[in-house]
C-alpha cells in the first residue's frame, strides 16, 4: 500500500491573491496582509505621540542604552592605490602619422621685413567663365605597323607569340530547364493497348537504304543493366530490436520499468479484454461512445467514493486515474501495452483519496514472417500504346441484293434466289426472362412477364439384358436398431428404510463424544 502524501496548506499570501479579486477573503486573512490587525493599530496610533528611539527596544538582540554602543576609533585603514591594467598589445595611432611643419619647404629669411608689399599683376582677372580654345590634332594613319619581335641572346630557340589581328568573338550560352513532376516518360514499355502520351515518335522504313557517317567505329561489349521493374527478393532477416540506441533514452526506459514492475508498490494485473487496446474507458464505467474523444491520453474518472458502482470489468474496480498507453518489450520478446492506474479506495475528511497503484498490461501476439512472393506488373503507363486507325478496322461492301449471280452448290437446289432468302437468319433466339410491353409512349405502359416453360424430364426405362448382364435396381435398406442395455442399479444409493431422519449425515462429520473416566 502506498503511503499517503500530506498536502501542504496554502499560505496567507496565496489565499489573499485568489480571493481579493472576487471579494471573498476572510477577515483574518484580509487584516493580516493589509496590516490592519489589533497589534498593527496599537503601533500605528501609539507611535504618533510616543518616541522610543533611544531605549534600544527592538525585535533583535541589542546592546541598548547610552553606554552600550562602542564609539568609533580614530584609526581607519586606508586602502592602497588600485593597480592599472595595461593592455598587452600597443594600440595603433588613429589619424595622420606624419606631421609636416609649417614652411618647411620654403623657410623665411630672418632678415626679411615683416611687412610684405602687394604686387600688381597688371590685367584684372576675369572671374566670369569663357569659351576655351580647343585645337584638334589629327595624326595620319601609319602605313607600316611595326611588330615587336623579342630578341633572345644565347644558344636557345626563340619563342614567338603570334596574336591574331581579328580575335574570335566569345559568346555566353545559358540553358534553363523546368521540371514537371506530374509528367514522367518511361523508356521501357510493355505491349499494352492504350493511348500514346509521348511526343516523340520514331518511324522505321525497310528497304530505304542508309549511309555510314564518320570513321570506323570500335565494337565495345555492352553489359545488360537491370530495368527499373526488376528487383531482387531479399532474404528474411531477424527482426531488429531497436533503431538508434541513445544512452539517455535507455536510462529513462530503465526508470520507467523500475516504476511499473515494482511489486512492492505497484499491483500487476494482466488484461485479456481486447477493449483495453482501443477504448479502455469502457472497462472502468458504463458510458456512450464518443468518436471525438481521444483514448490515447491520461483519463481521470470523477466519482463519489461513498457510492458503490460496479465496473464492467472487475479488475478496474475503484480506478480513479488511468494513464496514457506505453509500449515496452516483455521478457518473451513481444510488444507489451501498459497503462498505469490509480485506485481511490479510501477518502479522508480533507478530501484526500488513498489507493494503490496498478499496472495494467497486455501482450500482443507474434506476427509470423511470411514467405515473399514475386509480384507482377499491372496497369498502364505512359508510352505503352498501340494506335489503331478506325478506317482499317471495318470493310464496307456496297452491293445490290436483287442482282445476285447464280451460286453453284453440290446439292441440287433451286437456281432462283431472292433478297428475302439471303436475309433469312436461321439462328434460334431465346426470350427467357423477358417482358412483353403493351401500349404507346403517350400513356402509361403495362408490363407482363412471360413465364419460362421447361420440358419435363424424360422417363428412363430400364430394360433387362437377356445376354447375361444383371441390372440392379436401388431399393430401401433396413438396418437393425441397436438397443444398449441400461444399468439396473442407480448411481446414487438412497436409503429408504429409516424414516426418522430427513437427511443423511456422514459419520465423519459427527461430533466425537469425550469419554469421561469415573473414579
Swiss-Prot record:
Keywords: Capsid protein, Cytoplasmic inwards viral transport, Disulfide bond, DNA-binding, Host endosome, Host Golgi apparatus, Host nucleus, Host-virus interaction, Late protein, Microtubular inwards viral transport, Phosphoprotein, Viral penetration into host nucleus, Virion, Virus entry into host cell. It comes from the Viruses. Signal peptide: none annotated. Disulfide bonds join 19-25. GO terms for molecular function: DNA binding; structural molecule activity. It is found in: Virion; Host nucleus; Host early endosome; Host Golgi apparatus. InterPro entries: Late_L2 (IPR000784). Highly phosphorylated. Its main location: virion. GO terms for cellular component: host cell; host cell endosome; host cell Golgi apparatus; host cell nucleus; viral capsid. A motif (Nuclear localization signal) lies at residues 1-10, 511-518. One of its GO terms (biological process) is viral penetration into host nucleus. It holds the Pfam family Late_protein_L2. Minor protein of the capsid that localizes along the inner surface of the virion, within the central cavities beneath the L1 pentamers. Plays a role in capsid stabilization through interaction with the major capsid protein L1. Once the virion enters the host cell, L2 escorts the genomic DNA into the nucleus by promoting escape from the endosomal compartments and traffic through the host Golgi network. Interacts with major capsid protein L1. Interacts with E2; this interaction inhibits E2 transcriptional activity but not the DNA replication function E2. Interacts with host GADD45GIP1. Interacts with host HSPA8; this interaction is required for L2 nuclear translocation. Interacts with host importins KPNB2 and KPNB3. Forms a complex with importin alpha2-beta1 heterodimers via interaction with the importin alpha2 adapter. Interacts with host DYNLT1; this interaction is essential for virus intracellular transport during entry. This is Minor capsid protein L2. The gene is L2.
Amino acid at each position: 500500500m502506498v503511503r499517503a502524501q500530506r498536502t501542504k496548506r496554502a499560505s496567507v499570501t496565496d489565499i489573499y491573491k485568489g480571493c481579493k479579486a472576487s471579494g471573498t477573503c476572510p477577515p483574518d486573512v484580509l487584516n493580516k496582509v493589509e496590516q490592519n490587525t489589533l497589534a498593527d493599530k496599537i503601533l500605528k496610533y501609539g507611535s504618533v505621540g510616543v518616541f522610543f528611539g533611544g531605549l534600544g527596544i527592538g525585535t533583535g538582540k541589542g546592546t541598548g542604552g547610552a553606554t552600550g554602543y562602542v564609539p568609533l576609533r580614530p584609526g581607519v585603514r586606508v586602502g592602497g592605490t588600485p593597480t592599472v591594467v595595461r593592455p598587452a598589445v600597443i594600440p595603433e595611432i588613429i589619424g595622420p602619422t606624419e606631421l609636416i611643419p609649417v614652411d618647411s619647404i620654403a623657410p623665411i629669411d630672418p632678415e626679411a621685413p615683416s611687412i610684405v608689399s602687394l604686387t600688381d599683376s597688371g590685367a584684372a582677372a576675369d572671374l566670369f567663365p569663357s569659351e576655351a580654345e580647343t585645337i584638334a590634332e589629327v595624326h595620319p594613319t601609319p602605313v607600316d605597323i611595326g611588330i615587336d619581335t623579342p630578341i633572345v641572346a644565347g644558344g636557345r630557340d626563340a619563342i614567338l607569340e603570334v596574336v591574331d589581328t581579328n580575335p574570335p568573338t566569345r559568346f555566353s550560352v545559358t540553358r534553363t530547364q523546368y521540371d514537371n513532376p506530374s509528367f514522367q516518360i518511361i523508356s521501357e514499355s510493355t505491349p499494352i493497348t492504350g493511348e500514346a502520351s509521348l511526343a516523340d515518335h520514331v518511324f522505321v522504313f525497310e528497304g530505304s537504304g542508309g549511309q555510314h557517317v564518320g570513321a570506323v567505329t570500335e565494337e565495345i561489349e555492352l553489359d545488360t543493366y537491370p530495368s527499373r521493374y526488376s528487383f531482387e527478393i531479399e532474404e528474411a532477416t531477424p527482426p531488429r530490436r531497436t533503431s538508434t540506441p541513445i544512452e539517455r533514452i535507455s536510462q529513462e526506459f530503465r526508470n520507467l520499468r523500475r516504476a511499473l514492475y515494482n511489486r512492492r508498490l505497484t499491483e500487476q494485473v494482466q488484461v485479456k479484454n481486447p477493449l483495453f487496446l482501443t477504448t479502455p474507458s469502457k472497462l472502468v464505467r458504463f458510458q456512450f461512445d464518443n468518436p471525438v474523444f481521444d483514448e490515447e491520453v491520461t483519463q481521470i474518472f470523477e466519482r463519489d467514493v461513498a457510492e458503490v458502482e460496479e465496473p464492467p470489468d472487475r479488475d478496474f474496480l475503484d480506478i480513479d486515474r488511468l494513464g496514457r498507453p506505453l509500449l515496452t518489450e516483455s521478457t518473451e520478446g513481444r510488444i507489451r501495452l501498459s497503462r498505469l492506474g490509480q485506485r481511490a479506495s479510501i477518502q479522508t475528511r480533507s478530501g484526500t483519496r488513498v489507493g494503490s497503484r496498478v499496472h495494467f498490461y497486455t501482450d500482443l501476439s507474434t506476427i509470423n514472417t511470411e514467405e515473399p512472393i514475386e509480384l507482377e506488373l499491372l496497369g498502364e503507363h505512359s508510352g505503352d500504346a498501340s494506335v489503331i486507325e478506325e478506317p482499317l478496322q471495318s470493310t464496307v461492301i456496297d452491293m445490290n441484293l436483287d442482282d445476285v449471280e447464280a451460286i453453284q452448290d453440290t446439292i441440287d437446289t433451286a437456281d432462283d434466289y431472292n433478297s428475302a432468302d439471303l436475309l433469312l437468319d436461321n439462328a434460334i433466339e431465346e426470350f427467357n426472362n423477358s417482358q412483353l410491353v403493351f401500349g404507346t409512349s403517350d400513356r402509361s405502359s403495362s408490363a407482363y412477364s412471360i413465364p419460362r416453360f421447361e420440358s419435363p424430364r424424360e422417363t428412363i426405362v430400364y430394360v433387362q439384358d437377356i445376354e447375361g448382364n444383371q441390372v440392379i435396381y436401388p431399393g430401401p435398406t433396413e438396418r437393425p436398431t441397436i438397443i444398449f442395455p441400461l444399468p439396473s442399479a442407480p448411481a446414487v444409493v438412497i436409503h429408504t428404510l429409516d424414516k426418522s431422519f430427513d437427511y443423511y449425515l456422514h459419520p465423519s462429520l459427527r461430533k466425537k463424544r469425550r469419554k469421561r473416566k469415573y473414579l
